[in-house]
Amino acid sequence: MTEKELGILDKKTDKELYDYQKGAIDQIFDKFENAPDDHHLLYQLPTGGGKTVIFSEIVRQYLKTHKKKVLVMTHRIELCKQTSAMLTSFGVTNKVVDSKANLDDQEDYSCYVAMVETLNNRLNDDKLDISDVGLVIIDEAHYNSFTKLFKFFDNSFILGVTATPLSSNKDLPMKANYDELIAGESIPALIENEFLARAEVHKYDMGLTSLEVGSNGDYTVKSSEDLYTSPAMLQKTLDAYKKHSEGKKTLIFNNGINTSIMIYHTFKDAGLQIMHLDNTATKKQRKQILKWFHETPDAILTSVSILTTGFDEPTIDTIILNRATKSLTLYYQMIGRGSRILNNKSKFTVIDLGNNYYRFGPWGADLDWGAIFRNPEYYFGRIKDDETIESEFRHEMPEELRQEFSNSNTVYFDIRQVYKDATFKGESSKVVLERSIEQHAKICIENSEDIYDALGLAKMLGEDIDARIEVYAKCISKSTYNFIKWLREDYRKKLNSYLRKNFDEVFEQIHGHPPEE
């Protein structure tokens, strides 16, 4: 390394490191000094914690103290450019090895930044000399595409960095490619110390059993689009936005381009400022859309997966998960887009329309990443499937409707528990719906002065009735469309009949006197 390069590395950067970042750097350098030269180390830090800042400072210090070169690998071209710019801000002169790069001057550089596929091609063509690379840094190390390049670096120290040390393929665990994990500052600690914003989650109980799982272990685009492009689902997404985040800058994640486009039209037709972005957009279009999103206070941007990494927009107030995923990494990446601190922004909103909260728990849970790294099979085995998640749903009456039943102390009826009790006693399953009808009738009568009031309230219970029927059908393992449709109609008829027949008697039991004539 030349004296000029050393002088650049010695200059003070404009990046002030936090104590937890300095601590991480010290831990990693301790491994450099004491572990074998070919050691594979994984470092975990949440999105927004400053992984790029940390490994840029590591590169700067490494080049000062080691007479070897550094290679930084990313999985997307946007990340290549951002990483190169960050390294430059730390005084590290670097060369981006892309498909158009001229490598005639590679001897002039001590640090390279490359995208995984481009690097693979250059190495297979023997176009890049890596004989003197002592440190390889892998950004977003949970992607398995990097592992095919490990064979080129048998004598290099490999440092993988990721927010979620869980492989995108459960059959290829990260512990197979990394010797150990260093877990950085947790999300709760970063929130407490005001480095990240706190998430306020609004979760919806979603019926997702129609979704299919593909070969990659996640829900297929086709089955997701079939569900999320339905008129009812599009309206639910719009209603959820209006209820929790109207007027706030919002980023929507979908599992399919068609879904995103239909969300765009649904919100546009409602008079909202929204744009759609997917991977078919040109660089110019993407730049224009992201500029608009940054500058427009109440902007809504609907997208697929293009903005899960390499995108930093601290002004985001709301994240809508208009999709389900079985990937913990994707779950954390999507929510993490809203977690950046800005001025007085200490919290942000998450609207979950994919049961992701129920599947993975709250974003920001203090997960034991060490245990997950060592035994990912145990973690995967604890993730609830959709049927289990939905079996635990408890339907709550909407607030506006609940006001109509203000005289009732409780309006909830546990179909599942009543079914279990009836089965234990050897009773017919039919008694479950009979008791449900009696309870519905009771709360109608509690809030009525005459039979006409009660019948009017019964009409308002449609959603509550349907929810009970859904649970009942699952209890008896009979859930065909026609059967459920018949049950719903029959329930309504029997409820009205029960009210007409028993109104006076039940009213007197409740109030201690008969209804007025």
Describe the residue ranges of each PLM region.
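Conserved pre-motif I regulatory segment
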Residues: 2-44
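Walker A/P-loop
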Residues: 35-58, 277
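Conserved Walker A/P-loop ATP-binding site and its immediately adjacent core
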Residues: 52-54, 63-89, 257
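Conserved helicase ATPase core of P-loop NTP-dependent helicases/translocases
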Residues: 81, 96-107, 124, 261-265, ...
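Post-DEXD/H (motif II) to motif III coupling segment of the RecA-like Helicase ATP-binding lobe
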Residues: 142-201
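Conserved interdomain linker/interface between the two RecA-like ATPase lobes of SF2 helicase motors
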Residues: 180-256
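Long, largely alpha-helical accessory region at the distal end of helicase-like NTP-driven motors
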Residues: 236, 242-243, 249, 259, ...
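Conserved segment of the helicase C-terminal RecA-like domain
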Residues: 330, 337-368
